[in-house]
């Protein structure tokens, strides 16, 4: 074993004060010579995906101790995007990713941990942990907390998206409030991340594909005993990584990130993965561009029809063999890469079984011949925009219509629920980007309202984000954003907007001279914010680069 980072705080007579403090924690003479492993635990009692993490972290500790290490646990914040949705709180969600990365870096570097096990589940927590892992570049394993079991009512499986869309149905008069109350009470039966292939679960799948979680981790439900076993085995597995000094950047490489994108395309994952994978690549100093996503989308078919686009929950994916089974299906398209388990990605794939051919379809009978995400470019989004094409009906892949412009989500939501939006419209919600929001809030309330009210031919375009639970023709991450003078800032009511998912284009059909005149008169709309949002707005970059702090 090479010299340990933790030797800095415990070797030599000069470190007697440091050792004295360690002894005050109960560290023994034997333990003071062993590898010190940090456990970044995002447990709290407000996020359903995190209420069970203390139990998982305890298992990680057991594994570390059994393998010859000393565990030291510390806390990490976590925000529930569902609870934060639809109000001012959503502006704080994406900034929390940077806080998580920063706080883990602070703990790892101050205490000179030799290795790190991250225990987290939800949308911004796991990306923040991965950003910290590649930034600090020490041996790291991520234990994702797992999905909640589906809810049930009348023999139908439910997820949180049923409740969000129920709000729109009540507004449209197609559902009674009593029925919505039943959904509210039945949809979310316990701990774990929301049940479909939303952002949290997609990022868990990306983490496993990159090689940063043990095989099978992503799809195991939160309440399964298998999750406890994986947590303990992850604690055991970190010690060999420390002894070999196999660091996070040995695992997270350009090839492993591209493997993650391939699985993302096959699953039809959340648009937020584009933002997070770009951010992880930036932290790891790996060249990755939005063009890479389009290139890979052309190579990989969409083979898993997962919620919200299709009928299958994460529980169904687990029963079908989980991510190892997806890797088996895609093996010929993947690059072989190391994983934290000690197995190569090909070995993981070859050890797997595909247990349900309907959930994990063959490459010859896909849901769609192209991957589930598309990056659009054009005069409205010169630096790109993202759409979950897997969740858009083919009949609206090509759309031209008049713009209905809103300066924030709230008035757009009111217009949707009051049916002031007309079929054929292109709803523009701007000044919701990384800097303009600030915080690039998600628009799940608005998109779910569109679905619930029953619009069939309306597209929604924003410089903000969408939830992984969003379905329908919803285009986000428009870059440059309105707050920095991007073309979306110049759109006026009635302007013609042309979207073509087949050609991957998004255009503002206005004479360039008119746009030049508008740009000369344009002034940025900046919301008055204080504290963390004020600091964030000053330093955050654009969505096409991952919205990382500069």
UniProtKB/Swiss-Prot annotation:
Encoding gene (name): ilvD
Stored InterPro entries: Dihydro-acid_dehy_C (IPR042096), DihydroxyA_deHydtase (IPR004404), DiOHA_6PGluconate_deHydtase_CS (IPR020558), ILV_EDD_C (IPR056740), ILV_EDD_N (IPR000581), IlvD/EDD_N (IPR037237)
Pfam assignment, any one: ILV_EDD_C
Co-factor requirement: [2Fe-2S] cluster; Mg(2+)
Natural source organism: Methanoregula boonei (strain DSM 21154 / JCM 14090 / 6A8)
Keywords: 2Fe-2S, Amino-acid biosynthesis, Branched-chain amino acid biosynthesis, Iron, Iron-sulfur, Lyase, Magnesium, Metal-binding
Modified residues (N6-carboxylysine): 124
Cofactor stoichiometry and binding remark: Binds 1 [2Fe-2S] cluster per subunit. This cluster acts as a Lewis acid cofactor.
EC number: 4.2.1.9
Function: Functions in the biosynthesis of branched-chain amino acids. Catalyzes the dehydration of (2R,3R)-2,3-dihydroxy-3-methylpentanoate (2,3-dihydroxy-3-methylvalerate) into 2-oxo-3-methylpentanoate (2-oxo-3-methylvalerate) and of (2R)-2,3-dihydroxy-3-methylbutanoate (2,3-dihydroxyisovalerate) into 2-oxo-3-methylbutanoate (2-oxoisovalerate), the penultimate precursor to L-isoleucine and L-valine, respectively.
Binding site for Mg(2+): 81, 123-124, 442
Family statement drawn from the similarity comment of this UniProt entry: Belongs to the IlvD/Edd family.
Signal peptide from the UniProt entry: none
Quaternary structure and interacting proteins, as annotated: Homodimer.
Alphabetized GO MF terms: 2 iron, 2 sulfur cluster binding; dihydroxy-acid dehydratase activity; magnesium ion binding
Protein's recorded name: Dihydroxy-acid dehydratase
């Amino acid at each position: 074993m090479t010299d340990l980072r933790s030797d800095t705080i415990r070797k030599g007579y000069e470190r007697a004060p440091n050792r004295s403090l360690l002894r005050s924690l109960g560290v023994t003479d034997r333990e003071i010579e062993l590898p010190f492993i940090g456990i970044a635990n995002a447990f709290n009692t407000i996020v359903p995906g995190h209420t069970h993490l203390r139990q998982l972290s305890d298992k990680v500790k057991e594994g570390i101790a059994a393998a010859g290490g000393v565990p030291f646990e510390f806390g990490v914040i976590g925000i529930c995007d569902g609870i934060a949705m639809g109000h001012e709180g959503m502006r704080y969600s994406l900034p929390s990713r940077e806080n998580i990365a920063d706080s883990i870096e602070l703990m790892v570097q101050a205490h000179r941990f030799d290795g790190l096990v991250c225990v987290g589940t939800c949308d911004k927590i796991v990306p923040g942990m991965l950003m910290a892992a590649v930034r600090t570049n020490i041996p790291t394993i991520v234990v994702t907390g797992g999905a909640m079991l589906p809810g049930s009512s009348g023999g139908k499986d439910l997820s949180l998206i049923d409740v969000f869309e129920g709000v729109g149905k009540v507004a449209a008069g197609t559902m009674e409030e009593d029925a919505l109350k039943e959904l509210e009470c039945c949809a979310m039966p316990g701990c774990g991340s929301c049940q479909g292939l939303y952002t949290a679960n997609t990022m868990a799948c990306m983490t496993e594909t990159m090689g940063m979680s043990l095989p099978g981790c992503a799809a195991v439900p939160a309440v399964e005993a298998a999750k406890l076993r994986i947590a303990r085995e992850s604690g055991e597995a970190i010690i060999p990584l420390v002894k070999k000094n196999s660091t996070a950047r040995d695992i997270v490489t350009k090839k492993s990130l591209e493997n993650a994108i391939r699985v993302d395309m096959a699953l039809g994952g959340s648009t937020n993965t584009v933002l997070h994978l770009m951010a992880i690549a930036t932290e790891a100093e790996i060249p990755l561009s939005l063009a890479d996503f389009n290139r890979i989308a052309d190579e990989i078919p969409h083979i898993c029809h997962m919620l919200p686009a299709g009928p299958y929950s994460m529980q169904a994916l687990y029963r079908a063999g989980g991510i190892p089974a997806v890797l088996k299906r895609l093996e010929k398209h993947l690059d072989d890469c190391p994983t934290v388990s000690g197995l190569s990605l090909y070995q993981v794939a070859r050890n797997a079984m595909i247990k349900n051919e309907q959930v994990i379809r063959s490459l010859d009978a896909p849901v769609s011949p192209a991957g589930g995400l598309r990056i659009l470019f054009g005069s409205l989004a010169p630096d790109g925009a993202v759409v979950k094409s897997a969740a858009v009906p083919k009949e609206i892949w090509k759309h031209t219509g008049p713009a209905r412009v809103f300066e924030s989500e709230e008035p757009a939501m009111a217009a949707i629920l009051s049916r002031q939006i007309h079929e054929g419209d292109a709803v523009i919600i701007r000044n919701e980007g990384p800097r303009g929001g600030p915080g690039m809030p998600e628009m799940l309330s608005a998109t779910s309202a569109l679905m619930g009210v029953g619009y069939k031919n309306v597209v929604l375009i924003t410089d903000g984000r969408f939830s992984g639970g969003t379905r329908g023709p919803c285009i986000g991450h428009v870059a440059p954003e309105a707050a920095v003078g991007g073309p979306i800032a110049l759109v006026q009511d009635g302007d013609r907007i042309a979207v073509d998912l087949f050609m991957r284009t998004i255009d503002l059909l206005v004479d360039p001279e008119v746009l030049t005149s508008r740009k000369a008169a344009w002034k940025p709309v900046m919301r008055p914010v204080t504290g963390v949002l004020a600091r964030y707005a000053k330093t955050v970059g654009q969505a096409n680069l991952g919205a990382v702090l500069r």
